[in-house]
Structures are given as C-alpha cells and as structure tokens.
Amino acid sequence: MICFSWVSQIILAIISFLWLIPYYIAFKVGNHKYMSNALDLSCNNRYTLMYYSGFFISIVWYIMPFLNQPRFKLNIFSLFDTKVIILENVLYNIILIALIGYFMFVWGTKVVNCNLQATKDRFLHPSKLITDGPYKKVRNPMIMGDLFCHLSFILLLGAIHTLCLYIIYICINITIVHIENKYSLRVYFKKEYKEYAKNTPAYMNQELWLFAIFYFTIIVINTYLTTLYI
C-alpha cells in the first residue's frame, strides 16, 4: 500500500513537471511571434492559452495530499480521533486553515489585483513592470503565496509523501520564474528590470522568512508527535 502511494505521488509529480513544456512554449515561441508582430496580443491566441498550464500544475498539487498515504498525527482527518490530543489538533487545524485563508484570499487578492494592472489583456507581454504593492517586498509574490498556500494545505491534511516531494513543486515554480524572466520581463523591460532586481529580493524577505521558520517548526513538532505515537 505504501509503495502504491509513493508511485501515485511520483507519477502526479512527473505529470505536473511535464506541464512546464506548454508553459515554456507559450513564452519562448509566443514572445518570438510578438516581437516579429506575427501574433496578436489578445488573450485568445493559443500561446496565451498555453500559459494556463501553470494553473493545471497548481491543481495537481492540491489533489496529491488527498491521495492515500501515511499522515502526520495532527491533521484535519484525525480531528475527532479520540487517540489524538484533541486540543492541540484543533489548534493545529485552526492555524493552518487561517494560513490558507491568508495566503489564498488576503495575500493572493492583493497580488492578483496588482498583477492584473499589467497582464489583464495580455499575459505574455505585460503592459508595465510592477514594482509597487506586494511586488515592492519581493519580485515574485504570487509564486511565494502559492508555495506557502500549498504547504499549508499539505500540512493541514498531514500528507507525508506529498510533503517529501514538495521540493519538486518548489523547483517547478523556480523554473516558471526563470521562464517568465528570460522570455518576458528581461526582454521588454531590460534596464528597468535590472535595477528592480538589484533592490528587491526574488523570493524571500524578512516577513516570509518568519513564515518559513514557523512552517519548519510545525513540521518538526508534528514529526515528533507522529513518531511518539507509533
């Protein structure tokens, strides 16, 4: 059973990684056509549609924690398990649900609203370089919000195998950032982006490092409790 769990998780992780191919094509080929005036800038062309492969990657990683696999002692499925310390489990789940809500609706809404100022009509060719709002803190706030939201969801469900493979999802998102930078931002904004990159961290500022430390603490505590009750 554990072997099957690993296989299913790895297969989905590979599928999500392969979704980078249309994403790469969208920026590599699509932007070349933009530069040669051979492609309209509307959101209806096939290259813009390929951009949405990034959303399928995200969905796959929301599905993976639900699959059958070993789980941490504290998780939402064991909320009413009498063998689990109820008070700690309730508090654990409340905290993670709050974190999901924050990164999905508070952080996410701010970033999306800010992002749409430049990408509403054309995803592959932003109308301007966004450097204010959340983008003043880090250059990739949308990616960071997505990563922390997925991590919260994985921990809420106590999905151990998905957590072990989470590094793959991080690598996928770093690849997405590299693709966007190389074929879009660095092409259209050049000096402006170079100056922006000098003064703004790509992924982590002090606030996000505090979140990362908090998540690490949660993982360590839950790992300890899980091994304690084996």
Predicted segments, located by residue:
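Helix-capping/helix-break motifs at membrane-protein junctions
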Residues: 139, 189-190
